[in-house]
Amino acid sequence: MLKSKTFLKKTRAGGVMKIVREHYLRDDIGCGAPGCAACGGAHEGPALEPQPQDPASSVCPQPHYLLPDTNVLLHQIDVLEDPAIRNVIVLQTVLQEVRNRSAPVYKRIRDVTNNQEKHFYTFTNEHHRETYVEQEQGENANDRNDRAIRVAAKWYNEHLKKMSADNQLQVIFITNDRRNKEKAIEEGIPAFTCEEYVKSLTANPELIDRLACLSEEGNEIESGKIIFSEHLPLSKLQQGIKSGTYLQGTFRASRENYLEATVWIHGDNEENKEIILQGLKHLNRAVHEDIVAVELLPKSQWVAPSSVVLHDEGQNEEDVEKEEETERMLKTAVSEKMLKPTGRVVGIIKRNWRPYCGMLSKSDIKESRRHLFTPADKRIPRIRIETRQASTLEGRRIIVAIDGWPRNSRYPNGHFVRNLGDVGEKETETEVLLLEHDVPHQPFSQAVLSFLPKMPWSITEKDMKNREDLRHLCICSVDPPGCTDIDDALHCRELENGNLEVGVHIADVSHFIRPGNALDQESARRGTTVYLCEKRIDMVPELLSSNLCSLKCDVDRLAFSCIWEMNHNAEILKTKFTKSVINSKASLTYAEAQLRIDSANMNDDITTSLRGLNKLAKILKKRRIEKGALTLSSPEVRFHMDSETHDPIDLQTKELRETNSMVEEFMLLANISVAKKIHEEFSEHALLRKHPAPPPSNYEILVKAARSRNLEIKTDTAKSLAESLDQAESPTFPYLNTLLRILATRCMMQAVYFCSGMDNDFHHYGLASPIYTHFTSPIRRYADVIVHRLLAVAIGADCTYPELTDKHKLADICKNLNFRHKMAQYAQRASVAFHTQLFFKSKGIVSEEAYILFVRKNAIVVLIPKYGLEGTVFFEEKDKPNPQLIYDDEIPSLKIEDTVFHVFDKVKVKIMLDSSNLQHQKIRMSLVEPQIPGISIPTDTSNMDLNGPKKKKMKLGK
C-alpha cells in the first residue's frame, strides 16, 4: 500500500518545485510474538518470548509485554538494561525519536535489542498498515507521535487476542506523561508510569534504586533554602551569546580545588580564552565537561587562580556556610597582573553527564534511604541517591547516574545503576579506571570477529601481488620485554656502491582491516591499544595483534616497508615505499640488542646490522637536536609482578639504553618520510600529527624555578629552550637538569592528529619537524591504519574509497583519536597509581629522599627519583593547629615557621598508604627532613594511625 503526499516548494531562484513524498505500508510485518498464526513468523532477529517469564507484577499479574514511550527509553535506560526487564516492544517511532535526541542512549538501546537473552523486539509501526497514523491538521509532531504509540499499543492488545481463545497475553504501555497515560486508559490500553510498574515488581526491589528522577529541577528538598541562582532558558542564553553579553564554553572542574573551575571559551577569536570561576554560587550547578554560558564579572571582581589544594569533605547540606568562609579565604591579595578574567555560570547549554564510578558514603541514620555517593573522579560533585541496598553496597564500587540538580540542594540527585565489586580488588579497580576513562573494553562482538581471516592462515599468491619479497634480508625487531604485538622491524646493510640501505618494516594491518566493515568500525571507535600495568586492552582482536600482524621471528609476515639509501653520514639519497613480505631473523629486547652491540665477540649479520643502525641513529639524533628538537624527561616507572598473584613486588624507574634511542630515531624518520609522501599526494586529505608551540605563559613555572637556582631558561624558540636546558647544569646538583626537563614537559601542549585540509599549521614543536605523522604502530593506533591506506593509494598498492578523501570525515576521525589517545594516557596513569598503592600496601612505611617540583599555598609537590613517584605533602591537617604559612608566588617559595621551601629543594619524606578514605585510598607523604616542630614526623612511625579520625555522623536533607 502506498501513501503519498504532494506539496509545492519555492526555490531560491524564485521558481516553484513540486515535491512528492511516498510512504510504503505493508501488512507482512511480524509482531515479534513466536507462535502468532496471524504473522506466520514474519519477524526477523531477536523475538519476544511466547510465554513471558518476567518477574511477577502486582499491577499486572498475567503474562505481558512492555511497550515504553520515548521519554521512558531516554530517561529510564538503566532500568530497561537490568536483567530483570525482558520482553519489551520498541516501536520504530520511539527509536527514531531517541536517535534524534540522544546518540549514547540510542546506542545502548540498540545493544539491548541485539541481546537475544533480553527478548527486546523492534516493531516497524511506521510501515505497518494497521499502525501507521498521519499527522492531523493542527496536531504537532510530538502529539502525533504519542498518538502513534497508543495506536500501536492498542493494535498489539487486539492482535495478541487472536493467537488463541485462552490467551491472556497483554501489552502494558509504560509512560511518565500523565496526559498520555490518561488518554491510553480512556482508549482501553493498560498503562502505568515507569515508577508504578517498577514498584509493582515485588521480587526485584533493587530495581527501584535504578529509577531516574524525572526533571532537571525536580525532587527539590522540602523547605530547602535556595542556594543557587536560576539557570536562564536556552532562548535567552542564545540571545545573550549572540549579543556578546554571555560567553559559551566548556566547563572544566579542578581536581585540586572543588570550589574552582575554568571555562574554555568556544570560537575562533577566543580560542585560547579561559575564564576562572570561584565559589559554589558562581559554579552554579555546572558539572565537569558541561557546555555552559558564563557572564564575565567586572574587573574589580576578578581573582587569581587559587594555589590552595581543597577537597570536598563536607558531610551535610548545612556545610554551605562553611564553604562560603573557605571561599573568602581563597581570595587573598595578589598583584594585578596575576588576576584572570573571572565569571559566573548563568545557564547550561548542554549537559554532558555520564554514569560515574565511585562509592556510597552511607548515612549513619539507621532508617535513612538517602545517602551521598562520592565519585572516583574528584572533578565530579557528590551525588545524593535513594537506595534500599545501602548495607550491601557499603565498601563496594558502584555506578551512579545524575538525574538533576535542584536550586536548593548542595548536591545533585541521582540513581544507582550497577554494582562493580569490592573496593581495592584488582578486577574491580581496573574496571573502574576503564569506565572512568571511557576505554572501550568489552569483548569483540561476533560481527567484528567474523571479518578475521580463517585459520590456518598463510600468505597466498594473491597476497604476493604488488609486494616485494624481502624475506632474504637480515631483519630483526627490538622491543620491551614481553612484547607480543610487534609493529616494527629494522634492517641495515651495505650496498655494492658503498652506501647503506636501511629499512623500517611495519606490520601491514590495513591488509586485514578493510574500510567500512565491522572490524574497521570497531578499531576506529577504540582508536588505540591501552596498556595497563598488568593487562592490555587491544584495539584489534588478538588473532591480529599477537599473531598474524605481529612481526615475530622465523615466520613470514606481510609488511609495509620504508627503505632508504643513505650515505655513512645518515643523509638520505633515495626513499622507497613498498608493500612487502618479510621474515624477521630475531625478536630482541632492548637489553639483548644492547648486549649484541657492545659485545666484542659477536659479529654475525644481526649484530652487524644493529651496529650500523645504532651508528646512524646517533648521527640522526645529533642532527635533530641541532635543529631544535627537545629532549625532555618524565618519571616513568616499571613494576615487577609476582608470577602467581600478579601483585607488584618491586617498583623502579625505567632504564633507557642506546637501543631505545636507536629504534626511536628510525621510527621518527619513517614517520617524517611518510608524512611528506602522503601530503604530496593528498594535500587536502593527509592525516598528520602536530605539536603546537606552548604560549609563553606556560613556561612561567619553569623560568621561575630555574631563576631560583640562578639559571636562565630561554623559551622564545624550541631551539633556544633546548640549548638553555643543555646548559642548565650544576656540578653540585647533577639531578637538577633532569628536574628542569621534567618541569619543561609539564609546560608542553598536547600533540594532536589533524587533517591537512583543515589546518595550515603542520609544525611539530617537540621534534622540530615541519611535518609529521604516525605510520609505525598500526597494531595499536588507528591513525597509522589510515596513514597506511593513504600511502598504499599514493604508491598504487591499493585503491581509494570515498571516506578516505573526505576531509570532514577525516577531521571527525582525528577528533575521536585525540580523545581516545588522551583517555588512554589517563587510564595508564591511573593504573600506575593503583599498582603503586598495592606496592606500598605490602611494603609498609618507607622513608626516601625527594625533590620539590611545585610549591603551593598549603603544600609542596615532590618527586621521589628512586620510584619515579610524585606526591603532595600537606602542611594543614584537620583537627590540628595550622602552622603559619607565607606563600610567595613570584619566587615561588613557601615559608613555614622559620623554614623556607623553594622549587628543587631536597627533602626527606615518609611514604605510606593512607586507607582512611576507602573511596580515595592514596599514597600519603609526610615531611621528615628538614625538621620543623609540629610539622615534621619522627623517623619512627610504627605507631602512626593511618586510618584517620573517626567518622562523624552524617546528616542529609530529608
UniProtKB/Swiss-Prot annotation:
Modified residues (N-acetylmethionine): M1
UniProt cross-references to Gene3D superfamilies, sorted A to Z: 2.40.50.690, 2.40.50.700, 5'-nuclease (3.40.50.1010), Nucleic acid-binding proteins (2.40.50.140)
Bias (Basic residues) ranges: 949-958
Annotated PANTHER family: EXOSOME COMPLEX EXONUCLEASE RRP44, RIBONUCLEASE
CSD1 domain boundaries: 227-319
Residues the record lists as Phosphoserine modifications: S215
UniProt record similarity statement: Belongs to the RNR ribonuclease family.
Variant or mutagenesis effect after changing D487N: Loss of exonuclease activity. Loss of endonuclease activity
Name this polypeptide is given: Exosome complex exonuclease RRP44
Organism lineage: Eukaryota, Metazoa, Chordata, Craniata, Vertebrata
Other remarks on this protein: The association of DIS3 with the RNA exosome complex appears to be weak explaining its absence in some complex purifications.
Record's GO cellular component terms: cytoplasmic exosome (RNase complex); cytosol; exosome (RNase complex); membrane; nuclear exosome (RNase complex); nucleoplasm; nucleus
Domain CSD2 positions: 372-438
PTM sites of type N6-acetyllysine: K18
Pfam families: OB_Dis3, PIN_4, RNB, Rrp44_CSD1, Rrp44_S1
Enzyme Commission number(s) of this protein: 3.1.13.-, 3.1.26.-
UniProt domain RNB: residue ranges: 467-792
Assembly information from the UniProt record: Component of the RNA exosome complex; within the complex interacts with EXOSC4, EXOSC7 and EXOSC9 of the exosome core complex (Exo-9). The catalytically inactive RNA exosome core complex (Exo-9) associates with the catalytic subunit EXOSC10/RRP6. Exo-9 may associate with DIS3 to form the nucleolar exosome complex, or DIS3L to form the cytoplasmic exosome complex. Exo-9 is formed by a hexameric base ring consisting of the heterodimers EXOSC4-EXOSC9, EXOSC5-EXOSC8 and EXOSC6-EXOSC7, and a cap ring consisting of EXOSC1, EXOSC2 and EXOSC3; DIS3 associates with the base ring of Exo-9.
A single GO BP: nuclear mRNA surveillance of mRNA 3'-end processing
